[in-house]
Amino acid sequence: KNTGRRPNYRECEMRDGECNAKVAKTAEPDSKTNTTGNNSFAIKTSTLLLAVLLF
């Protein structure tokens, strides 16, 4: 489609001389993602909260 403005080449894929919208990739977590830091933070804060509530 010609909208009268210059196409942004980051948003489109040129095919047959026309700018077609790119299909966005969904961010899927891979098995290499390191979540150890986030999990240990949750464990430390929950333990601290439990100690404060009990004493």
UniProtKB/Swiss-Prot annotation:
Glycosylation sites: 34
Highest taxon in the source lineage: Eukaryota
Location relative to the cell: Cell membrane
Positions of GPI-anchor amidated asparagine lipidation: 38
Keyword Phosphoprotein: no
Residues cleaved off as propeptide: 39-55
Database matches in InterPro entries: VSG_C_dom_sf (IPR027446)
Main location class: membrane
Alphabetically ordered keywords of this record: Cell membrane, Glycoprotein, GPI-anchor, Lipoprotein, Membrane, Trypanosomiasis
Record SUPFAM superfamilies: Variant surface glycoprotein MITAT 1.2, VSG 221, C-terminal domain
Keyword Lipoprotein: yes
Protein's membrane topology: Lipid-anchor; GPI-anchor
UniProt GO cellular component terms: plasma membrane; side of membrane
Physiological role: VSG forms a coat on the surface of the parasite. The trypanosome evades the immune response of the host by expressing a series of antigenically distinct VSGs from an estimated 1000 VSG genes.
Name of this protein: Variant surface glycoprotein ETAT 1.2
Organism: Trypanosoma brucei rhodesiense
